[in-house]
Structure formats: structure tokens, C-alpha cells
Amino acid sequence: MQAIVIAALVSVGVIAQAQQPTTAARPTLPAPDPPPSPAAMIARSKALELNTPYVPPPGDPLVHQAAGFAKVICSAVFITGLDPDFAAENVGYFTAPYEIRAKLGKPVVDREHKQVHVAVPGGVTRTAVFLGDQGCVTLPVGKDSVSFKPLELKSTLPDASTQTWPMGDLLRNEPPAPELNMAKVKQAVDAAFDPPEAKTAAFLVAWRGRLIAERYAPGITAQTPLESWSMGKSVTATLMGVLIQQGAYELWQPAPIPEWQEETNDLRSEIRIADLLHMSSGLRIKAPEDPDYDPTGTYADHFYLYTGGMNSFHYAATRPLQWFPGKVGRYRNTDPVLTNYLIRLAVENRGEEYLWFPRRALFDKLGMRTMVLETDPFGNFLAQGYEFASARDWARLGNLYLQDGIWNGERMLPEGFAKFVSTPAPAWVADHRPIYGGFFWINGDGEYPVPRNAYFMSGAGGQKTMIIPSHDLVVVRLGHFKGANEANQSFKNALALLMEAVPPNK
């Protein structure tokens, strides 16, 4: 059975068992704006394109997909705690497409050595190894170890069960606030799990910083770290915001990537940190959300930055410019990878341990105990999408933004940073797509039945953390990747019901 928790004002008040699945309420949803013409986007980008070469990633795509499959199963088993056969059927299609899995050997899980091996028929075997607090890492072909020293990152926080929300998981029993329609909230939770094919694993609603509802699929708890994919880009933005608040960088300064300083007149040296956060660097790679993407062509760099088993920072830094910075917005993993590069440079330049930085500077301060950031074999965070966390931890991060970057009286993010990440990037607006800010998506086209100033973290497979300032709401939905096709609609249905359940701010 799925447990449902409903409450108001302070966390959870009433704990009850969910009823047998019923048909959830299906509200009428407003129509979003029509999408821009791909042809017009392509034409505009072609007119601005620079004459630079494109060199695809090296290696056999099937070998890269085997690496992705091994890593996905490794993380599912050793981080989330899933059964390997369930994981092979249900999770992580992004770097290991379901249709490709039949072409590969069945994952071999070595629990003693905490490794997963996937063989390419007639070829190499790719291996992912669990490294504790660095999660699972794909080993380079021919290597049996990583090129960095893994660290145990123990939280300094007390046991979560002894601390009240949000710094802990202890939930106080208080009656619902009279202005909330808790029957509608219950309907919204039902809608988030309907249909079962959506594979929703966790759904959580926080109002004014306090939990008012949550439910988990069988085998999943409030402390289970789940696949979150590109919601990690928003973690990356937050870590950069912390560094800016600490004085390490300025938002609009040129990004001091070492590879761009080696030659005079390297136009990449004009890429600003804000351009990276805006997904508007102009760097040339192949990515699946490009309007002219051909999935039958060469293996996309966007995936290779996960599966290549190389120094991801150096690979991203050595891509040429396709457009001048800030002119064309494209959803490409180079930009968050390079932002993580800048994070490492700043942390190590002041003599601190890079792998410790997220926990000390962010996670422990917010009460986030479950977040795992995975790395490449060189110890570089792949926080463009290789991270795992519980729904409650994603809600904590969302509430930091709802509170304008202030937590327990401390300004953790610069004043105006939350507005920056939630304001449409100019290069995206130029394509009539007011949907992307600073490593956060924006409801600027009305795709979701919430106000258009709502903004959200989003990951492949239907992962969402929606921040709705007009209603003081943070809504988290996590699920298994196989349900991606149904997940978005069920999430929209849940949001529409929440808009009926929760009054707007006065």
C-alpha cells in the first residue's frame, strides 16, 4: 500500500493508509502557448552560426550505452536500494535507452565489490563501481579504479528523526489550516499516482515551508534517494549562487575557464558565468533537444558527458563556439558541466576540499541528508544529472528559493539570485521560448496549470520540483523513468487540483 500523509502549517498531522487505487479527479487544463516553429529556430541559429568544426565524441555508441547501463543499475541498487531486475526494466533510460538494453549483456551485479558490469557482445565490458558518498562512477575502458581518492562525507547534522522539519524529519501533529481545502489536496495526491503506468515513486506538497501532503510508492520512503536527473542542474546553479554570495565570483563576469585563457583572442573567454547558467554559452556540441537533432547520427556529446569515462570538465572546455555567447539558447550539458568546473576551481583555489563543498556549504545548512552527487573518474561532479535525493530534500532546496535564498536567517544566495534563475534568458526569449532561466525551467508558456511566474527543477523521466511563489508552494514529483510518457500529464492534473486547494497569497 502507498502511505499518504496530510497536514497543515507544520509538516504532517494525520498519517493514514491510502485507499485502493481509484480514478483520480481529472480537471480541465488550460491550453499552453503553441511551441515556436523548429524551422524558425533553425533558420535564426544558422544565420548566427560561426564557421567552426564539429568533431563527434570518439568511440562506439553501444560501448557508451553499456557504460550508461552499468552506472544506472549500480546507482539503482547501491543508492536507491532497488532490485536489479526491476531497475533494468524501469529506471534510467536517459543514458541507457530501453530499446538498446536488449543489445547488451544482462547487468552483472557484484555485491561483494559493489560493482556492476555490462558487456557489449563480442566487445568490451563496461564497469560502474559504487564509491560510497560519491555514488557510482563509470570506469574508463581498461581501467579498474578511478583517478581520485573517494571521501566519506559524513553529515554534521544530528539524526533527522530527532529534529523537526525542515532541518529534520520529525513531523508535528497539527490540524490543517482552515484556508486549505484538504479534500482537494488529497485528490491532488491521488492524481499524481494516476495512472499507475506513470510510475510515480514520491509526491510531496509543501505550503509556506511546511509539509501538507506526501505519498510514496511501495518500497520507497521519505528518506529514499531517487533518480533525479537534470534537477541536478538546479543544484549546480545553487552552488554557484553560494560561491557568488561568498565573493568567489560575480554573476556577470567572464567565466575563467583555464582552457580559454591559453590563447589570445579566444572568443570563448567572453562567455560569462550568467551565459552558462542561461544555457546560452554558444558552445558547439550535439544534444537531443536541439531543434535539428538527428538521433540516427553520431553519438551525442550531451550523453557522452555522462558515459564517456573521461575528464568531463576538459572535454566540455575544449568544445568550439558555434555562436557568440548569449545569442542562442540551447539545452546542452556543456554549460552545467563547465559551471561545475568553475565551482571546483573556486573551492580548490582557496584551499578547500572540493568533494566536501556541497555538503558543508549547502546540504547540511538546509537539512539535506540524502543528496548524493556522482562524479566522473577524475572526481568532477556530474551534477548536470547524476545525482540522487529524497523528495523531502528536493522540497528543502525548493523552499530555499521560495525564501529568496535565505535560510534560518542566513542569506545563502545573493539578493536577486532567485529572480535571476526564474527570469527567462534573453537568448531563449529571442526564439519565442520564455521557458528557461538560470538552470531552472519557467512556466512562461503556460505548459503547466499554475501561474506563469512559477519555475521548476526538471529531470528526465518526469522528475519535477515546482516552485509557485504566488501560492507559497513547493511541489515535488519523483518517479521511475519507464513512466515518463504518463508522468507529465498526471503531474499537471495534480497541480491543477492544488490550485483549487490552496489560496493565492494576499
Language-model-derived ranges and their functions:
Residues A183-V185, V189-A191, R210-R215, Y249, ...:
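Short, charged, amphipathic alpha-helices and their helix-cap/turn boundaries
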Residues M368-T375, K419-V474:
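Active-site Gly/Thr loop motif
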Residues G209, L226-W252, L276, T339-I343, ...:
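Active-site SXXK
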Residues A237, M279, D335-R344, G385-W407, ...:
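Active-site-proximal alpha-helical segments within enzyme catalytic domains
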Residues P84, G247-L251, R344-R359, G405-L413, ...:
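Structural helix-adjacent loops and short alpha-helical linkers that scaffold large soluble proteins
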Residues Q246-R284, P288, T318-Q322, E348-G385, ...:
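Active-site helix/loop module of the DD-peptidase/beta-lactamase fold
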Residues M457-K506:
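Structured C-terminal helix/loop/strand segments within mature extracytoplasmic catalytic/sensor domains
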Residues G168-R208:
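Beta-lactamase-like hydrolase cores
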